[in-house]
Every structure is written in structure tokens, then in C-alpha cells.
Amino acid sequence: MSALPPAIFLMGPTAAGKTDLAIELTKVLPCELISVDSALVYRDMDIGTAKPSKALLAQYPHKLIDIIDPAESYSAADFRTDALAAMAEITARGNIPLLVGGTMLYYKALQEGLADMPAADAQVRAELEEEAARLGWQALHDQLAAIDPVSAARIHPNDPQRLSRALEVWRVSGQTMTEHRLKQSAQSADAGASGQSQLPYTVANLAIAPANRQVLHERIAQRFTIMLEQGFVDEVVALRSRGDLHPGLPSIRAVGYRQVWDHLDGKLTSAEMQERGIIATRQLAKRQFTWLRSWSDLHWLDSLDSDNLSRALKYLGTVSILS
């Protein structure tokens, strides 16, 4: 058995059933839950993020949920710092950190460390938003392709959050995101050669999703419709009424929120908002699958199977997590 303490990553696309399985695991294993979700960190954003209910969170606490205000930014570096601290606390209690969620960049940051990229710059971000409004996101994507074709190839023109971040990194630091990542890869290789690990845990990697992709698409559509019935629009109305939030913030750019915000701005009808929200969520799931396909040592579970708990426990036993 490894001398490093154990941890479990439970990954998967949105609407795949990660939370349900995580809770089942905590009932039979000495696990404590850590959320790995870039939207669940925000307070007062409950319906559109499909946040577990307050009653469920009271019974099965998740760390890193409801930790910042929607006006604030929360980076992958922030997550790594907070997650490592939470994992250390859980391990010190003799329990296993069980990290559950679908923000794959957070998992990657935790597992491999982060390149030394510049912090967010409000002025540069505002300039990019103005350019996008004037020229369109495709024009900004063309800019990125000219300076950083590698990043441009993996970032879609309709992904404004990642596109603006890539351009922001270049404008602030004078180096592209690809250049920063190449530096980080070299540092990681050096660490590996010296026997150092970026993450001081023995990690078991689980992923859950329906084997039939159409089932996931149907779940996404159904869940978005239920969110609207639960008062998603009213939730965004309340956020707008604060007066300090705007579509340039990461919180409001979250899938679903930006479509409802545009609807309230009169840019989309109710039907268009619902359709685009569902499409954006499906696109998110597609990106999550892309990340997951590149993840090594990943054990897949089918959401539609009735015995995923026993399958997960069997796998965890084979990788010595339960030894």
C-alpha cells in the first residue's frame, strides 16, 4: 500500500448523478465531501446551479459550497488552496476526502498544480467585454488564433469565459496561456523526476455518466425545465436587484444564468432562453467528456446501472483505497 493517504475523485458531466453516488459512498465509507464545482461556490445561486438542498447539505456537509459572494471571483488557484486545506483536515481526522463535481479544470489544478498565470485584471476584462460587444466573440477568437493557435484550437468562439481569460493572460503578462502551461509542464516533469508529487495523495479516479448520451441530453433538458419551474428566473431577478452584478462576472457567466440574464435584458424570449440554456448545458457536458477522455486511470460507471455503489466499492478495493 502507498505511504500517501487516500483520496477519491468522483467526476462526470453535469446531470450524471455524481452527488447521489457520493452520498451513498459516505454512508458506507469514512468519507467527507468536498465540492469541485465552480458555480456551487457562490452564495444565493441555488436553483440555477442545481445546488443540493439545505436539508441535504445539513445531513451530508460539502466543503467549498456557498463560500463566496457572486460579486467575487474564484480561480482554480483559489480552489487548489482551499481544497488542499480541506483535504488535510479530513485526513487528520482519519477520514478519506471524497471530491465530487464536474469542474475538470479544478481537478487538473489539484492533481498537477498550476502555471504561474497572472491574476484576473478587471480593466483588461472590461476592455475585452467592450470589444466583444462591438466586434463579436469570433473577432476575439481570431485574435487568439493569431497569437496562441494552440489555445484557439481548444477554445470555442462561443465560450466567452475561457476565450476572454486566454486573451487576458496574454495582455497582462505578455505571454500566452500555452507558454505558461509549457513552463508548468516542465516544472511538473522536474518534480516527477525528483520523486515529488504535485498532490500528496493516492487518488482513485471514478467517473459516472449514462452510457447512452441521449439519456444525458434528456436529463439536462428536464433539469433545466424543473429549474425554471422552481423559480430560476426569480432567483436571477433577485441577483440583478442588488445592482452590483453584471454579465462580465464569472458568476453571471455561469451556464443558465447568462441566458436568463439576457432574457431579463429583453434579448431573448422565454422560449429562446430555455432553448439556449439547455444547449449551453449540453455543450458544457460535451466539454466535460472531452476532459474526462484525457484523464488517466479513470474507472467509469454507468449512471443507469442499479448497483453503482457496489461497483465503486469493488474498484476502490482493487486500488487499495480501502486497505
Swiss-Prot record:
**Per its UniProt record, what InterPro entries does this chain match?**
Dimethylallyltransferase (IPR039657), IPT (IPR018022), P-loop_NTPase (IPR027417)
Q: Where is this region: Interaction with substrate tRNA?
A: 37-40, 161-165
Q: Please list the residues that bind ATP.
A: G12, P13, T14, A15, A16, G17, K18, T19
- The entry's keywords: ATP-binding, Magnesium, Nucleotide-binding, Transferase, tRNA processing
Looking at the UniProt record, the site noted as Interaction with substrate tRNA sits at T103, R125
The top EC class, named as a word, is transferase
Residues that, per the record, bind substrate: T14, A15, A16, G17, K18, T19
Q: What is its EC number?
A: 2.5.1.75
Q: Which GO MF terms are attached to this record?
A: ATP binding; tRNA dimethylallyltransferase activity
Enumerate the catalysed reactions. Answer: adenosine(37) in tRNA + dimethylallyl diphosphate = N(6)-dimethylallyladenosine(37) in tRNA + diphosphate
- What is the similarity comment for this entry? Belongs to the IPP transferase family.
Q: Which PANTHER family match?
A: TRNA DIMETHYLALLYLTRANSFERASE
The entry describes its oligomerization and partners as: Monomer.
Q: What is this protein called?
A: tRNA dimethylallyltransferase
Q: Which organism is it from?
A: Pseudomonas fluorescens (strain SBW25)
